[in-house]
């Protein structure tokens, strides 16, 4: 084959015409120290705070300390194969996580990588883990209820969509159970739930995921987990990653419930990183910006204005106390940031009152305006009545001479405590909560012995489901009480049957069947 000089000449001319003088400028530094999830690098002169950097082994890190001679970096991945002298380069980006519908029903780590063995997550959408919270004019007042399905919370310390409500208590007082029950209760409510597990045992998270799957709640839930065995940087960014995933739905007009379980462990991880990065320690060895750590996270939960789509993100941060001390550093910080707190008391929990909500120390600052009318009417003074009952109960230990009014208050208080008890993973629809609280506050339970209260409740629900479903439907659709005469008549009829059944030894259900057959 003959080589033609003209063709070679034309090719050379084409190459010369297409030649562009380009220089790729990359800022590369050298690792001078690595260990315990952090690294120091020299030579990244123009690195920005929070910027993503890439190590030669493919791991990423986030620039945290910008000092004269070097940059302190937290490593988001495998740091055991990084060596002193390795190269590290800037990416010019901040950290982002995958977001979108593809994450629903999945278990992921804080980097958005799947942990459930169900294959890769097919989404091309990402959001930065750190984002500016909505401003004052981008928000609106909390006005819609976020029903937890727990009588003790929906009646005493109601939560609204877009609210931040702290759940605080010692270990093993039922904080996580409240989270799981609240998620289960969102079934059919068009709410996306995000459960962020920080520093928990892998076996515990597995049990929670299986519980959600069993009740069909995983169909609308994203689980973000940074286990106890994970490096501190992953525990630190886990809540921000979960919030970024929630913001994608919130800014598209949807309603989101995000649960941080728990922020105490995140604060401990941040303290560890700060001390390793040689930042000056403050109270309890936490760094000076530990308040900002949580405030910038929780401020991202909001009820957006109608101009922005009217979406919302409700945050339930959890904080663990030591021996019930809510005046410690992290608890007081988070209490001051949130719109109220639900305090779980270990003494109540071990006495069998579950959920162990302490009515005296728990408060919801904005949730009252989100309660439905029916619940406001039946539960208006319930929290104060319960708190005064606790005080009276303490005084009665000193003497037995009680006037009739005090005795009546004590009797009503004992029945209130019993009614607010609830089985695990059995959230109640709001219309049934209203029904039993109406029966309580209008004296229908005063003649029922305390040990029969929960039987009365269950049989009352069965009776109304079978005979007066229209009254329950009225509460559900109108959000208000039905005709009180009809409601009183129905409850009175059931109460008489229940009393007769107790006298004959039948259950109320059996008595009802006998009446139907007759």
UniProtKB/Swiss-Prot annotation:
Encoding gene (name): atpA
Molecular functions per Gene Ontology: ADP binding; ATP binding; proton-transporting ATP synthase activity, rotational mechanism
Primary enzyme class: translocase
Bilayer topology: Peripheral membrane protein
Catalysed reaction equations from the record: ATP + H2O + 4 H(+)(in) = ADP + phosphate + 5 H(+)(out)
UniProt xrefs under HAMAP family: ATP_synth_alpha_bact
Subunit structure: F-type ATPases have 2 components, CF(1) - the catalytic core - and CF(0) - the membrane proton channel. CF(1) has five subunits: alpha(3), beta(3), gamma(1), delta(1), epsilon(1). CF(0) has three main subunits: a(1), b(2) and c(9-12). The alpha and beta chains form an alternating ring which encloses part of the gamma chain. CF(1) is attached to CF(0) by a central stalk formed by the gamma and epsilon chains, while a peripheral stalk is formed by the delta and b chains.
Cellular localisation: Cell membrane
Protein name from the UniProt record: ATP synthase subunit alpha
Catalytic activity, EC: 7.1.2.2
A cellular component term, taken from the record's GO annotations: plasma membrane
Family: Belongs to the ATPase alpha/beta chains family.
Function: Produces ATP from ADP in the presence of a proton gradient across the membrane. The alpha chain is a regulatory subunit.
């Amino acid at each position: 084959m003959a080589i033609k000089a003209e063709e070679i000449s034309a090719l050379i001319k084409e190459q010369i015409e297409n030649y562009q003088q380009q220089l790729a400028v990359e800022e590369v530094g050298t690792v001078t120290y690595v260990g315990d999830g952090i690294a120091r690098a020299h030579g990244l002169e123009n690195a920005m705070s929070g910027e993503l950097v890439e190590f030669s082994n493919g791991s990423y890190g986030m620039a945290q300390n910008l000092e004269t001679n070097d940059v302190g970096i937290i490593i988001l991945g495998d740091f055991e194969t990084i060596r002193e002298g390795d190269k590290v380069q800037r990416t010019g980006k901040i950290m982002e996580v995958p977001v979108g519908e593809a994450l629903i029903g999945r278990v992921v780590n804080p980097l958005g990588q799947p942990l459930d063995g169900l294959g890769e997550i097919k989404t091309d959408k990402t959001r930065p883990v750190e984002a500016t919270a909505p401003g004052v004019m981008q928000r609106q007042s909390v006005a819609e209820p976020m029903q937890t399905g727990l009588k003790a919370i929906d009646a005493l310390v109601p939560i609204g969509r877009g609210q931040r409500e702290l759940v605080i208590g010692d270990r093993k007082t039922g904080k996580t159970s409240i989270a799981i029950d609240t998620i289960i209760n969102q079934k059919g409510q068009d709410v996306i739930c995000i459960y962020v597990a920080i520093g928990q045992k892998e076996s515990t998270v597995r049990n929670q995921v299986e519980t959600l799957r069993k009740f069909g709640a995983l169909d609308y839930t994203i689980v973000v987990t940074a286990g106890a065995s994970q490096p501190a940087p992953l525990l630190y960014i886990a809540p921000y990653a979960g919030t970024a995933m929630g913001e994608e739905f919130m800014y598209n007009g949807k309603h989101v419930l995000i649960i941080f379980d728990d922020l105490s462990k995140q604060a401990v991880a941040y303290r560890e990183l700060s001390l390793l990065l040689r930042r000056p320690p403050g109270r309890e060895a936490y760094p000076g910006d530990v308040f900002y750590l949580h405030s910038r996270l929780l401020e991202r939960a909001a009820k957006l204005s109608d101009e922005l789509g009217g979406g919302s993100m409700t945050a339930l941060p959890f904080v663990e106390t030591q021996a019930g001390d809510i005046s410690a550093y992290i608890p007081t910080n988070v209490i001051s940031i949130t719109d109220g707190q639900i305090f779980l008391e270990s003494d109540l929990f071990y006495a069998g009152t579950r959920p162990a909500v302490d009515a005296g120390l728990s408060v919801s600052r904005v949730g009252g305006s989100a309660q439905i009318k029916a619940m406001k009417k039946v539960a208006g003074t319930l929290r104060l009545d319960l708190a005064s009952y606790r005080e009276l109960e303490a005084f009665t230990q000193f003497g037995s001479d009680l006037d009739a009014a005090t005795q009546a208050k004590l009797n009503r208080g004992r029945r209130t405590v019993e009614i607010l008890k609830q089985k695990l993973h059995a959230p109640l629809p709001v219309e049934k909560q209203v029904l039993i609280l109406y029966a309580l506050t209008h004296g229908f339970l005063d003649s029922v012995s305390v040990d029969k209260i929960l039987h009365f409740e269950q049989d009352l629900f069965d009776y109304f489901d079978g005979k007066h479903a229209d009254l329950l439907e009225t509460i559900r659709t109108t959000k208000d009480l039905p005709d009180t005469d009809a409601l009183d008549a129905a409850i009175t009829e059931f109460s008489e049957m229940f009393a007769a059944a107790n006298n004959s030894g039948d259950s109320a259900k059996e008595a009802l069947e006998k009446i139907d057959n007759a």
